[in-house]
């Protein structure tokens, strides 16, 4: 019969009849069950008003509200639902449309008492038809109410539908609170699903409710609603509210919703549900529209096999009756599938679809779709089979329609998809109890795909880049499963291949593939390291790997497709998610979706009927783990997976660690940090372990756990952290086995924990995971550092033990590193507070070996530069590993940590200024951990750090000390700090009085600097020569920027800092090697800096007095402003990080908070003393690092910061510093306008602040030249040091302002870094890099597009200037309005001149605009380099075409053209700088190739040298001009060097040419103004 009834049509097309009674909508025990975590357990009520025949919805005070027509309705108020109203509950992906239509009620349904009552039989006959039509109509409808009459059935159907919707949502992950970032994306999928699902589902709901509508059920099944129904009858009728709902309801619901969303896909999903997670993992593949369904059959699941799976799963689900009812249609579908073997491509496409679309979706969502189990598992294979068969028909038809378009794409990826299906199948197998049929399927699949292993490996590697870790875990579990059963073994192998696609590491990764992966990673913000972790794939899994690779490619291709079919996504989330889809989804979903659905799902999976013992365990546990680690997308769904690629074998981890770095830059720092370190340390071991099959499952698991723990540390890392034992596995077979066992235990525990955590509200899970992640991160780092020592222990250890073992391991690692501070251990305990290298909350015992203590001071000789570099890389990795989730907290922690570190260092120095021995480690860090103190100490710490750095040089390296080490071995810092502190007051007082005093102070400062070598100079320069300090600081800043950039981007509390410290230290050590030449006296300076603590007590009063009181001169006013700004910036870096995190314009942020922070401790610190300045520089470096400033930006920023704070620092000082820094610094410093803007005169300090560009331009060219020229030589540095020392002493007087400026800038940098991390990730990082002068950073972070554009313009100008600086240093210098024009001579002459320019030493403080300019400069330079590279590539291509017919050495040319991939990566955490360097290197190579093409014999070169170059430059197009200019730049302006060449933009090149033609300073400013943010010239004529 039909009756008029109200329906809620979900966006997936599922119609839920609204019973004529009150129904509850929610996640638990509700008639209309929604799977979205954003939906409360009892979310809303839909009541029926019989008098008006209307349904009313009332929100039950839900967290996320109920929305009618996208308007949140008031709580506890009934709102009448009108026709076509759009109803949404929370942020559930199901948008229900209120539809009224006739519903044909099946006779069986009519017989159902409840249904009859509700329907009021008079209308029953037409209800079914109406239902069909309504479901067809309301594809977009997403109503949370289930038909009351069909409450159980409808509820389950709704659950199923909503699951489908939720799957769309859940894969994306709905946040517990707030609108998901992906909101609205699912409806497309839902629409598709609805098309397939709508009719059958409604019938199913109706029939299912009555339980008599077998036909309806069949129809429902056919449309994948049947799949749900099968689940639901099992779940609904037996115990709709009881066990099925609770136990399986969520997964089942998710599955159902998946099915509803993708009915066709859901057919296999029902299989999965019915299969009990086993044989119908293929069903998961079907999660993708029709994929799972076809997958089961296409996966070589004969109907017998399917039946076996179904039979196996029936035990899981008691759906026998339903199964029987559905068997007819299901069998028909299955038979049809078996006979016709609908193209695997169909379900593969579905899988691919789910991959691409659902790749962002959490695995468990995919699983839900595929499984169609409210409980997360389809209990019966039969059900799965029946659902599959029933829904497979519709699904296949739907998919045929849907995927014929996809088919073409999928055909390419078909083999991959098959492999993915295998992976999915194995995943399903893991989930389900049917290992054998699944194994067969997997085997068949793995055998079927004959995709070339290289391509598959490449694709696989791509996917395993993000996939690797999780597949590793899954493979571990799968290996376990292999042990469990032979078929399981096959599945495991397949799963390993699928999940373990990452298992095989491409021995010869395609450079193109790698590049493509990099590009993809970049696109998804995951591109930190160019070395992507490539999965170490077992030979036996190569096929699967191929499949996975193909599927990855398919997933990538389909990523843009709406993943209407999430069935495969489900299984792929389990297995394939581990694979290609994961890597895609990890990035895409990480980028877009950062929710915890995956956690939820994983928990569901853990709680799923199948324990963790089989593939299910692997799929659930392993998948969860892998999901956590490998399937970043899963993580993003479950817990907003950290943007950490799945943990590959450690060998690959190291590669992937870089990728993970990128990912983690957006991800939590700590998580990635640890992972990358671990990966670094144990990649080979992991690889070997992967190769060992016996150990492989566990080792993979461990690795996966480890990698995941590291990677997704914030996700469900506690469990994953057991994976930290992966290094242990890598250590040795024995350790591996032990670790495997322990890890297995730990994994089980973790899984339990995860289940608990996941079952707990998402927020709770997030918190748990976050805490765990931090711990795990730290622990993992230790483990990675010391995999042999702690692995087994760590495996055994669960969360705490892992932490402990990691503490020990970290300690050992620290010992090994000799840079990792004791803080590493504490890092675990106090995740947010502890800095690994910088300090530990707990005060270190004097007993702690110096090696363990990060050297606050630059360990010039303490730690080998290689160690330092290793630490730096580790630190960088670690920082990159930090999870984005914890990035906010981490950023704040990082800033606090930096502040604390500064305070501690200041305190340490204070404590150790008398005793400069290694006792420093025992200094009371706790006392110095005052946030406010930090702010003050932030700057002061550098000063204190000067002393303590030496003392703790080998004990601890703090950012400050590292920074100091870099800036000056740290001794100078102390000395300078001391002199600065005294000189600070004096300066404040004497600044106005006389520069002579400054000169005298500078002389003293120089003495310190000289005595301490170059190291001290930077410290002194902090006060006097911001740039001088900036150079070392820049070096450190670069290092730290590099490290801390990551850290700040992924603030990991102290850990990132520690890592950054270590990293900086390592970098500094590298720099120290260069600086060492200049600063052999570092230790000597230590004693000198004993005085440094003195300013500490007076810092606040002194700085404030200096800022506001005695030194209230105009210069002091500048200093005051600078100090205020610096203060603000320091505060910003320390306290303001949240501000930086805000999306407020950086400019706004910097502007607002600075004023707010005028009285902040930072200002005091800044004005307090040179020490503070040193600290400020250090902090700036930290801030830069935090802000993700790259090496170059750091230097640039630091100098600029210094310029702002201490504009007086002479360029020669900066040059010297640059030279001292060496080529590394040079690269950083080529952009360091600070040298340029570091005017020599105090007037310049004020005036150049306004016109710093010119000054910078003048100075910068020489300085940059010096840097470039003396990069390799320390001699110019020594001479420069003398000058700088003098200048510094003058500058020390102005140090207060400068230091305040520095502090402010560092604060800004921190803010910007935060903003970058939060908002732009990589791009912001670039800005951050350019933002080293924290203003820009803060501004960039805070500034909206317009502000950023302005900044970009600034940057462009700065960038152009930087190019110009190098090109026309003399002109610029001669044009310097200051009396320091003499400096405009040669870089070295300038270096010599600085002494003459003590006035110059009083650099004009750069205005915030200028600082921004630097930030923008870095950003713009980065963009320019990119543009230049692109244009050069284009030009090279064009030239190649032009000259292809000519006789050329094309092999050589092509190799040159491809050489960019071979460009050595500069060790810099600044993605911007490294990217710029890479781009410029590529440009250089391309230009070389172009040169070879154009002028193979050098005739043109000769002509050009004879005088045609001027004609050549203008003649070629801008792109070519840039190349030409770049090409000739070596001859024309060697000082420009690579950085300039890279920076050379077409416009910039022309500008550079003009500058080379001795353009006037006015021209510089014109160029600055002329260049748009793009670097394009606004007015070419102006340039002309």
From Swiss-Prot:
SMART domains: FHA. Residues 368-441, 480-512, 562-890, 906-1176, 1238-1260, 1325-1345, 1369-1399, 1508-1556 are annotated as: Disordered. InterPro entries: Cent_Immune-Sig_Mod, CEP170_C, FHA_dom, SMAD_FHA_dom_sf. The modification Phosphotyrosine is found at residue 364. Residues 1467-1495 form a coiled coil. Residues 853-1584 are annotated as: Targeting to microtubules. Residues 595-604, 650-659, 668-698, 728-739, 797-816, 906-916, 1060-1072 have a biased composition (Basic and acidic residues). Gene3D superfamilies: 2.60.200.20. Keywords: Coiled coil, Cytoplasm, Cytoskeleton, Microtubule, Phosphoprotein. Residues 860-873, 971-982, 1073-1103, 1122-1138 have a biased composition (Low complexity). Interacts with CCDC68 and CCDC120; leading to recruitment to centrosomes. Interacts with PLK1. Interacts with NIN. Interacts with FHDC1. Interacts with CCDC61. Interacts with TBK1; efficient complex formation may be dependent on the presence of CCDC61. Belongs to the CEP170 family. Plays a role in microtubule organization. Required for centriole subdistal appendage assembly. This is Centrosomal protein of 170 kDa. The gene is CEP170.
